[in-house]
Amino acid sequence: MTEKEQNAENAPKKLSLKRREKTTVSATTAGGKAKAVQVEVRKSRKIDTEAAIKAAEAAKLKAQEEAEAKAKAEAEKAEQEKATAAKVREKAAKPTKAEAKPENSTVAKAADPEKEKRKAEEAELRRKADELARQKAEEQARKAAEDAKRYAEAAKDTVEHHNDSDDFSDYHLTSSYAREAEDEDNRRRENHIRTGKNKVTKAKKGGRDDNGSKDERSADRRNQKDMRGKGKQSKQGKRGSTLQQAFTKPAQVTKSDVVIGETITVAELANKMAIKATEIIKTMMKMGEMVTINQVLDQETAQLVAEELGHKVILRKENELEESVLEDRDVNAEKVQRAPVVTIMGHVDHGKTSLLDYIRKAKVAAGEAGGITQHIGAYHVETKGKIITFLDTPGHAAFTSMRARGAKATDIVVLVVAADDGVMPQTIEAIQHARAAGVPIVVAVNKIDKPEANPERVEQELLQYDVVAEKFGGDVQFVYVSAKKGSGVDDLLDAILLQSEVLELTAVKDGMASGVVIESYLDKGRGPVATILVQSGTLKRGDIVLCGFEFGRVRAMRDEDGKDINEAGPSIPVEVLGLSGVPAAGDEATVVRDEKKAREVALYRQGKFREVKLARQQKAKLENMFSNMSEGDVAELNVIVKADVQGSVEAIVQSLQELSTEEVKVKVVGSGVGGITETDATLAAASNAIMVGFNVRADASARRVIENENIDLRYYSIIYELLNEIKAAMSGMLQPEFKQEIIGLAEVRDIFRHPKFGAIAGCMVTEGIVKRNNPIRVLRDNVVIFEGELESLRRFKDDVNEVRNGMECGIGVKNYNDVKVGDQIEVFEVVEVKRSI
């Protein structure tokens, strides 16, 4: 078997269908009868299987490899033969020594002609053999190349034919009706092409013509269909190419540098990292934090999240402007000695303000409501040629924050303790504030003129809190004074001046001023008013002051007596007008050079405070979500607080919030400094709140709204009364308690049977009163065996409503007949008990 025949045998087999083939298919008609349908196939289709395609490709590769190997072998063989022939020629051309060496001159001359002729013939034969070998090798190489080319073309035709037949591969999978319709369409199109283009005669009956065979016609139809299919594909390709998008999705997310400020929302962080916000929320859930898309994150948390997701973080300080404004100071100014700032602290009613009155020679205590101080008073006095600034703080428990502020702003604390009262809770608290601020203490034992005064007891009690007198080896000066009579006051001032000399207090006098807000309030005529204690520099009229969230130019300054002044040096308290709003007590007040920058810093602080507050509220909402759901209904008392000064507002709001219990919560809907306005009244009406005015009054428009809406408005000037009335209002909102009170006891002496009531107990009332309509208990051996009510109560034959102690009666117990002699019947009533906080 030749190689060509072997390749033909290995070629993939193809299935050919006849042009005309009939078959019968049984089908069911609509009536349910069987019907035979003849199916005729008129197309020649060649179906190549996938195995055949693979075999063709394998054959092509194998043939190409064999042809290349054969050509290489033939070329090597030809080279080898050529080399052998060359060696033979060289050997023949080289004469042997015997031949080359003539025996003698006569032998050389008489050479044999036959020998020369034979040599020439051998050389000619060798040349012809070389030529034949070369031609044979070239012919074999050419044949091998042609075979390889032929095999490659055959394989290519096989693949192309397989692609052409794809359109017809599902021919036998369609129904006979569809195939007949397709064949009819093909015949019609074929006849149209034949008559229109080629101008040939009509086909004979049976679909044949004289010029073409069956195979040619089928090939024509196939070519026409292929051309139509290619046209469609090219159109679709063009249309698809116009709609193709130019975007390609990156294979990997780029990790960029993320700039994070002091606060950033989850959405902003996701935007900077070019990821979805849900990824950040998932990451934080893994870290144990529940957040929402709008939640504000602090810088540290945002940094952790960004680094967790593989980004490099660049931290940015957003308060750079604030720092630059505050650092722009006079650094080379000379420091001079300044006056001490003294805060007078102690328990309520121990005589702090009265002591300060005597020092100032002014009757301030009489002007305070109820004789107690409601806010910080700041005064400076001159004694022995030296100035001392006094801060008078409230002693009531509600004013803790005020006392803390006073201790922070001060140099020396004068602790006033009543000699007849001793150490009290606010005395202890004042000691703690002074210790926390690191401020030395001078103890003034007041009310020494009272007969029941016992200053030694005060000294002993203060030892428990590490306040050791100098006579006990400590460093605390004790001065006995009487604020009423003025005894010992000069000694107290000397002690203060001595303590200030020890502290060596200095401050810059001529530089830009800075200080602290002691108190602030809203004056209806003058606007926001802040009491500022200057701590360094000199505050002048016209200076630009940055004060917490507020800023402004100083329009006017007044001292504690209400006199206008133009400047105030270190340790001098002044009232300042001209701020944009009411600053919070305790804020730092700083003079800056540029009003525009001051406004920017104030706005930045407001925005930052708002973000932090929002973040805190959001966190509280998420953390307390389930606890709030489980609490159920809790009564709420809504309150709106308006007061004359900021410190009083803080104290009242804090005290009200501390009144909250598990059953009733006080919710401060609104608070502020200044008079009660129409806006406050409208808010109270909308939130159903109580309005509380502390040393303020409502204006005319607010009073109209209050009358129309029937709002509960209350005025106070003493914080005791305010808190007591709020407690009473909260007590009214508590759920009442019910208590059972025993009102009578009867002992069973005999049992009678009654046809209507059953067992009737003949009883003697031993205690209290037995009433007809009250609930009862039956006791046997002091154990309750039944609880119910009376069905009848008789005395002799008369029905009565009650029987008193020491009288006999007949008692019928409803739904209970097992009463025995010796049992006790206990009569009680349910009493509602009002609760209070």
Swiss-Prot record:
<dbReference type="Pfam" id="PF08364">
    <property type="entry name" value="IF2_assoc"/>
</dbReference>
<dbReference type="GO" id="GO:0005525">
    <property type="term" value="F:GTP binding"/>
</dbReference>
<dbReference type="InterPro" id="IPR009000">
    <property type="entry name" value="Transl_B-barrel_sf"/>
</dbReference>
<dbReference type="GO" id="GO:0003924">
    <property type="term" value="F:GTPase activity"/>
</dbReference>
<feature type="compositionally biased region" description="Basic and acidic residues">
    <location>
        <begin position="111"/>
        <end position="165"/>
    </location>
</feature>
<dbReference type="Pfam" id="PF04760">
    <property type="entry name" value="IF2_N"/>
</dbReference>
<dbReference type="GO" id="GO:0097216">
    <property type="term" value="F:guanosine tetraphosphate binding"/>
</dbReference>
<feature type="region of interest" description="Disordered">
    <location>
        <begin position="62"/>
        <end position="251"/>
    </location>
</feature>
<feature type="compositionally biased region" description="Polar residues">
    <location>
        <begin position="242"/>
        <end position="251"/>
    </location>
</feature>
<dbReference type="InterPro" id="IPR006847">
    <property type="entry name" value="IF2_N"/>
</dbReference>
<keyword id="KW-0648">Protein biosynthesis</keyword>
<comment type="similarity">
    <text>Belongs to the TRAFAC class translation factor GTPase superfamily. Classic translation factor GTPase family. IF-2 subfamily.</text>
</comment>
<dbReference type="InterPro" id="IPR000178">
    <property type="entry name" value="TF_IF2_bacterial-like"/>
</dbReference>
<keyword id="KW-0547">Nucleotide-binding</keyword>
<keyword id="KW-0963">Cytoplasm</keyword>
<dbReference type="InterPro" id="IPR023115">
    <property type="entry name" value="TIF_IF2_dom3"/>
</dbReference>
<feature type="region of interest" description="G4">
    <location>
        <begin position="446"/>
        <end position="449"/>
    </location>
</feature>
<dbReference type="InterPro" id="IPR027417">
    <property type="entry name" value="P-loop_NTPase"/>
</dbReference>
<dbReference type="Pfam" id="PF11987">
    <property type="entry name" value="IF-2"/>
</dbReference>
<feature type="binding site">
    <location>
        <begin position="392"/>
        <end position="396"/>
    </location>
    <ligand>
        <name>GTP</name>
    </ligand>
</feature>
<protein>
    <recommendedName>
        <fullName>Translation initiation factor IF-2</fullName>
    </recommendedName>
</protein>
<dbReference type="Pfam" id="PF00009">
    <property type="entry name" value="GTP_EFTU"/>
</dbReference>
<dbReference type="InterPro" id="IPR000795">
    <property type="entry name" value="T_Tr_GTP-bd_dom"/>
</dbReference>
<dbReference type="InterPro" id="IPR053905">
    <property type="entry name" value="EF-G-like_DII"/>
</dbReference>
<feature type="binding site">
    <location>
        <begin position="346"/>
        <end position="353"/>
    </location>
    <ligand>
        <name>GTP</name>
    </ligand>
</feature>
<feature type="binding site">
    <location>
        <begin position="446"/>
        <end position="449"/>
    </location>
    <ligand>
        <name>GTP</name>
    </ligand>
</feature>
<dbReference type="InterPro" id="IPR015760">
    <property type="entry name" value="TIF_IF2"/>
</dbReference>
<feature type="compositionally biased region" description="Basic residues">
    <location>
        <begin position="189"/>
        <end position="205"/>
    </location>
</feature>
<feature type="region of interest" description="Disordered">
    <location>
        <begin position="1"/>
        <end position="44"/>
    </location>
</feature>
<dbReference type="InterPro" id="IPR013575">
    <property type="entry name" value="IF2_assoc_dom_bac"/>
</dbReference>
<dbReference type="Pfam" id="PF03144">
    <property type="entry name" value="GTP_EFTU_D2"/>
</dbReference>
<keyword id="KW-0342">GTP-binding</keyword>
<dbReference type="GO" id="GO:0003743">
    <property type="term" value="F:translation initiation factor activity"/>
</dbReference>
<feature type="region of interest" description="G2">
    <location>
        <begin position="371"/>
        <end position="375"/>
    </location>
</feature>
<dbReference type="Pfam" id="PF22042">
    <property type="entry name" value="EF-G_D2"/>
</dbReference>
<feature type="compositionally biased region" description="Basic and acidic residues">
    <location>
        <begin position="206"/>
        <end position="229"/>
    </location>
</feature>
<dbReference type="InterPro" id="IPR036925">
    <property type="entry name" value="TIF_IF2_dom3_sf"/>
</dbReference>
<feature type="region of interest" description="G3">
    <location>
        <begin position="392"/>
        <end position="395"/>
    </location>
</feature>
<dbReference type="GO" id="GO:0005829">
    <property type="term" value="C:cytosol"/>
</dbReference>
<dbReference type="InterPro" id="IPR044145">
    <property type="entry name" value="IF2_II"/>
</dbReference>
<comment type="function">
    <text>One of the essential components for the initiation of protein synthesis. Protects formylmethionyl-tRNA from spontaneous hydrolysis and promotes its binding to the 30S ribosomal subunits. Also involved in the hydrolysis of GTP during the formation of the 70S ribosomal complex.</text>
</comment>
<dbReference type="InterPro" id="IPR004161">
    <property type="entry name" value="EFTu-like_2"/>
</dbReference>
